[in-house]
Amino acid sequence: ALLNICLSRLSTNPLILFLFFGITSVLINAFCFKKYVKYFMISMLFYLVHTYVARELMQIRAGLACALCLFSLRYIVNKCPWRFLITIILASSFHLGAVVFLIAYPLGQYKFNSKKVAIAIICALIISSIFPLGAFFKSLPSYAFLNRIQYYNDTEYGQSSGLFTNVVIIKELLIIIVCLAYRRVLENIPYFNVSFNTYVVSLIWLILWNDFSIVASRIATFYSIGEVLLMAMLPFITKSGGSRNILAVLLILLAGVIMFMNIYTGKWDGVVII
């Protein structure tokens, strides 16, 4: 991407570039959490115990691009298409994959009912079972514009991530089911609709491309940016007072479980948070 080339001209030290991408991503995310949700610390906690490790430390360019996509949600909610477009162009200058987030603008303007969401997910499951898109893609002849993706065919990134054996798909499906069950309460929260709609797209994409993990994860990463926002909105499904505080504590404990799972699986090996 263009800005990556410009930054590399300023310094050849990879540590400086890493610090720039990492610090900028964290600051943008923290700013957005503070503006978008009431339970800021819940979003921040889930971000640090998982997203920060799985994305910012492993895909630093995608991490910054995702942070800018998260920032662009305000322009979807406030219906500022040109500002949204400029923000996505900026994100694309760091990681070209951010271009796919352009579809988020029209998605954010609609309120899909629970029935349509359920039908879309069921259709995705059926399609992935009878017509695996990854297998079809891998069978295509070698074209120049496909070379970059087809390179992963014979690597671990081209393998199937599974459907109901895929922890990410199960997690996203459970979050969506909870959101649908309490939608009447949650839909009154300003950023719920756009976060939920894009999150549904993330799940559908993961299901459709489950047999080609690199394609599934690269695109779903951008559409799952609202996950930490949705987690911070869940306390509102209970009545204010003790019940809401108890649910907030349970979410904090869940974040702790996720952190220990990441440590156990080795994702945190050598990671030191200062």
Stretches found by the model and what they are:
Residues 1-12:
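Short hydrophobic/aromatic helix or loop-helix immediately within or flanking a transmembrane segment
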Residues 10-24:
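Loop-to-helix entry region of an early transmembrane alpha helix in multi-pass inner-membrane enzymes
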Residues 30-49:
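Transmembrane-helix signature of polytopic, membrane-embedded enzymes
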Residues 52, 83-107:
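Membrane-interface alpha helices of multi-pass inner-membrane proteins
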Residues 57-63:
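Short acidic/glycine- and proline-prone juxtamembrane loop motifs at membrane-interface regions
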Residues 69-82:
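Membrane-interface transmembrane helices that cradle and orient dolichyl/undecaprenyl
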Residues 105, 109-219, 262-273:
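Alpha-helical transmembrane segments and terminal signal-anchor/GPI-anchor hydrophobic tails
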Residues 122, 239-260:
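Signature aromatic-anchored transmembrane alpha helix within multi-pass, membrane-resident enzymes
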